């Protein structure tokens, strides 16, 4: 089988791993699998800190993930090579030419593994991790019934097969690090793990399961059909996104050329940026229509312990660049240390980005956005104070979900839908309008206060 056409879940299915629990309703397969995935990711860093006390030796660890990085601990980030599987339209060209063999630096880089259009790996979330003591694969994919399934394994054979699949993609992407990765992984030699490691990680995953909820038994009932308006909106967002993705793929290819003038490159970068903004907007609208059309008994967004500090560190520079293009100044007052909150980090970043875009495109002649984060009892208070130089551009309702700005042609989610999204994210949004040019938006998010028990294992494991 061509490794580039292989999904990682195919490795588990072909190895005889079980399918979904037939005692559960199929509509709960995805939220249940997501819950298990979030629990495993939350358990990973505590597990690595406990089992790899001497991080920083001759052979650093390797962590290949998709579609986003999973390691955020500063010590682990310094000592793990990280590769991120990235759709081709989001891929940034390698900073050095293929064939150049790099060396491990003091802080290993975070490289991108380009996924070409239609690559089935883009449909999965995974973390492939290798150290001298053990290897681990975490995967949110699909089972043989086509339903969402969470898999995890320390099995060296499956880890080796997964590496062959990832290695093929690195070859096609002309990774400058491939030779060094091959040598390092050959030195690790896919070790057989100590059984205590497997037991310990399994216990940690149970300890870190996010916001448990009861999944109902399977009941035969007809699913509510989405309204024609919702179906039309979903179809339109798809039709808009598809050509924009193609255009963005072409701009990425053009940006790799060395024979273009600075002025041409500047214009291509502008096209790429506008396509990216539109794609993000369409993604959020599509996600919102999907959630709004889901019947209440089935409407679940799995929540997990979320580093709000990481969300804002990644988002604020991006939002500031976006604001500057519309002559808007975004100032942020972020405390040095923030408690973690219960939320969904991926959707939270998406919704916050949509709010920022709504602000900056609604301002008439520029303006200011002040972001301030404070604690309020057992909650974090995130407040946006927005002020336009002139009266904000008028908007009008477009159906039950959207707002439309006739002057700019901008589409955005209305405040009712945005409030519903924050409620699903474990928070609350309050919108207060002081004047036609000034608004204050306050978001409350529940702080994570539990103490997670840690199994009583030795800090160091003697491997045999």
Swiss-Prot record:
Q: State the phenotype upon gene disruption.
A: Loss or reduction of expression of about 20 genes in response to hyperosmotic stress (0.5 M sorbitol) or salt (0.5 M NaCl) stress. Increased survival after heat shock from 30 to 48 degrees Celsius for 2-3 hours. Increased expression of some heat shock and photosystem-related proteins. Cells die after 24 hours of heat shock (32 to 44 degrees Celsius). Increased expression of some heat shock proteins during normal growth.
First-level EC class: transferase
Q: Where is the Histidine kinase domain?
A: 235-449
**Species whose genome carries this gene:** Synechocystis sp. (strain ATCC 27184 / PCC 6803 / Kazusa)
Q: What is this protein called?
A: Sensor histidine kinase Hik34
Q: What induces it?
A: Expression strongly induced by heat shock at 44 degrees Celsius for 20 minutes, after 60 minutes expression has fallen.
PTM notes = When expressed in E.coli autophosphorylates at 18 to 30 degrees Celsius; less phosphorylation occurs at 36 and none occurs at 42 or 48 degrees Celsius.
Q: Which domain of life is it from?
A: Bacteria
Gene of this entry: hik34
EC number of this enzyme = 2.7.13.3
């Amino acid at each position: 089988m061509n490794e580039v056409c292989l999904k990682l879940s195919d490795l588990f299915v072909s190895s005889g791993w079980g399918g979904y629990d037939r005692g559960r309703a199929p509509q709960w397969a995805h939220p249940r699998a997501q819950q298990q995935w979030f629990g495993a990711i939350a358990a990973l860093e505590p597990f690595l800190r406990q089992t790899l006390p001497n991080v920083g030796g001759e052979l650093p660890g390797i962590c290949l993930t998709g579609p986003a990085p999973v390691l955020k601990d500063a010590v682990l980030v310094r000592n793990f090579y990280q590769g991120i599987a990235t759709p081709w339209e989001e891929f940034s060209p390698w900073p050095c030419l293929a064939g150049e063999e790099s060396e491990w630096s003091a802080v290993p880089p975070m490289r991108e593994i380009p996924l070409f259009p239609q690559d089935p790996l883009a449909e999965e979330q995974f973390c492939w991790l290798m150290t001298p003591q053990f290897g681990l694969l975490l995967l949110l994919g699909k089972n043989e019934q086509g339903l969402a399934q969470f898999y995890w394994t320390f099995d060296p054979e499956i880890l080796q097969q997964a590496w062959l699949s990832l290695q093929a993609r690195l070859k096609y992407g002309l990774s400058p690090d491939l030779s060094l990765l091959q040598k390092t992984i050959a030195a690790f030699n896919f070790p057989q793990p100590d059984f205590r490691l497997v037991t310990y990680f399994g216990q940690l995953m149970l300890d870190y399961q996010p916001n448990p909820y009861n999944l109902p038994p399977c009941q035969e009932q007809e699913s509510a059909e989405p309204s024609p308006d919702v179906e039309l909106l979903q179809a339109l967002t798809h039709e808009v996104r598809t050509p924009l993705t193609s255009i963005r793929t072409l701009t990425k290819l053009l940006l790799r050329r060395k024979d273009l003038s600075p002025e041409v490159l500047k214009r291509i970068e502008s096209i790429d940026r506008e396509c990216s903004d539109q794609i993000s907007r369409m993604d959020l609208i599509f996600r919102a229509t999907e959630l709004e059309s889901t019947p209440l008994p089935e409407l679940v967004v799995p929540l997990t312990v979320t580093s709000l500090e990481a969300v804002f560190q990644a988002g604020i520079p991006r939002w500031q660049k976006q604001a500057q293009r519309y002559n808007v100044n975004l100032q942020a007052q972020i405390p040095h240390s923030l408690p973690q909150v219960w939320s969904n980090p991926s959707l939270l970043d998406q919704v916050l980005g949509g709010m920022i875009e709504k602000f900056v495109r609604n301002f008439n002649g520029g303006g200011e956005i002040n972001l301030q984060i404070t604690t309020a009892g057992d909650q974090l208070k995130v407040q946006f104070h927005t002020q336009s130089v002139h009266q904000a551009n008028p908007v009008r309702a477009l159906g039950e979900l959207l707002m439309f700005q006739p002057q700019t042609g901008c589409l955005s989610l209305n405040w009712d839908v945005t409030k519903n999204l924050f409620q699903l994210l474990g928070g609350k949004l309050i919108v207060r309008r002081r004047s036609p040019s000034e608004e204050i938006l306050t978001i409350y998010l529940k702080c994570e206060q539990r103490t997670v028990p840690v199994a009583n294992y030795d800090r160091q494991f003697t491997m045999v």
